[in-house]
Each structure stands twice: as structure tokens, then as C-alpha cells.
Amino acid sequence: MPKRSVVSLEKASVASSDKALVVSSDQAPVLSPDKALISEATPAWLKLKELTGARIALGRTGVSLPTKDILEFRMAHARARDAVHTALEIEPLFKALVGKGFAPVTVTSQAIDRHTFLLRPDLGRRLSVASAQTLTTLSHDTSGPLPSLAFVIADGLSAQAIQGHALQLLEALRVELPQVQEAAVVIATQARVALGDEIGEILGAELVVVLIGERPGLSAPDSMSAYLTWHPKVGRTDVERNCISNIRLEGLGYAESAQKLAWLIRQAKVLGKSGVDLKEESES
């Protein structure tokens, strides 16, 4: 190739590079933190946000969430973990129930500790040998007819929910259904829903209601559920239960929950069944 051709190519290359690097100031992108990187929720989203504790309308900073929302998410996650691992404070709950005229009994499942309870759900569904014997003795020693209704106050996956809502719901339910005062009340630890079946069977209860702490969510670490089962016995399945969930101040309030539960209890006795055969149609 002739020398002059090489020089011409080099000049053309340099000229092309210089042209590519030259950008006028009025063409350069402007990255303003106040305008380009930060975005807040619109008024419409903010109005929806007032109606729920769910994480909506968080806004953004660049491609991420604002620092405030990230920290709140981590705090919610920590609260949920604490709710799962925190033990139920039995003594204050026991005394509070006695103070309201109930006669509670305490039992535990076959899960010997929280670690076992979380890893072995099956053990949380059966009573320990000692607890089964305690209830058997109690059912034999009781003078007069056995209670037709039994309440099991179970820690489940959120002792915090039980600590905060169980007694309040029972008080509200007593207004709707005065015979609640005569019901058997059992406090159960390391307990799953199905533990109520064995408890109800041993006590000879017609109906068992299990008040249990729900699995914590990131916006609700203290949510409680009420499970109702007609003629409880070991082996009952979820299809034979009725459930009222999200019982808490920010969810379904005590009065409304009590109205629904009282309706279900009455209808279960009328129909002689619970679960999918009993549809909740109360007007509350």
C-alpha cells in the first residue's frame, strides 16, 4: 500500500475520534438528584396507602427504594422473626383469664422446645403424654356434665398475637354468647391448630375453638385466627374446620370477630357440622 494512503487513513481515524469525543455542553445529560433520581407516589396511590398496611406507593431513588423504606422493611422482617421465636408468657395470661372468671388449664404439645416445634409440625399437633394424662384426669374428676364448648388458646407461630388479643376476643364473645363463661379453657404451648382436636376429644367437647397466632407477615406480626371444629377428634382435617383470620386492631376487630364466631358456634350446633358444610353468613 502506498505511504500516502497510510497517512490519509491515520488522519481520517484521528478526525473521526476527535469528532466522537466532542459533546457540546447543552447536549450533556443533567443528573439532578431532586428531579431525575427521586420519585414519590402520586396522590391516588397515597390515598390507597391509607387503607392498607401493605407495602405500596413507596416511591424510588434511582432504581432502588428510598432508604427510609428499606430500613422499615428490615425492621418489619425483624419483628416477624421475633414473633415466631418469642415464647408465650403463660403466667400473666393465666392470671388474666382467672381474673375474668375462667378456669384455665395449661398443656404442651410433643414438641419439647421452639426449635423442635418449627422443624416438626407433626409434633405440635399431638399432646405430650403428661398433658394428655392431665386432661384425662380432669375430664374424669369433673362433677356434673362436661362442657360442650372448649377454647384452646395456642401460641402457634405468634405468641405476640395471643398475648395481645386472646383475652380481649373472649370478653367480646362473652357478650354475644354468655355460655362462653362455662366453657373449658386450655392454654397450649408449641401448639398447631390440630392440637385442639385431641384436647376437645379428651374433654368430650361438642365443639372446640382454637385461638392461635398466625404466621407473621411483614406488616402483621400479631395477627390471630380462630378455628372452629365440630366434634373434635384426632384425624380431623382442615376441610372440617371454619376459620376467622386476621383478628387484630388493624384487621378484623374484636367485636366483629366475636359476632362472626358466635354465629358459627350457633349454626354448628344447629347443623351438627362445621367446615365446608357450614358457610359463614352472619350480617356483621
Name what the model sees in each region.
Residues 80-95, 100-103, 165, 172-185, ...:
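Alpha/propeptide regions of enzymes that mature by internal proteolysis
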Residues 120, 125-139, 146-152, 156-208, ...:
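Conserved mixed alpha/beta catalytic, RNA-binding, or beta-rich assembly cores of soluble enzyme
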Residues 214-284:
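C-terminal functional extensions of proteins
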Residues 5-9, 13-17, 21-25, 29-33:
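Ser/Thr/Pro-rich low-complexity tandem-repeat tracts
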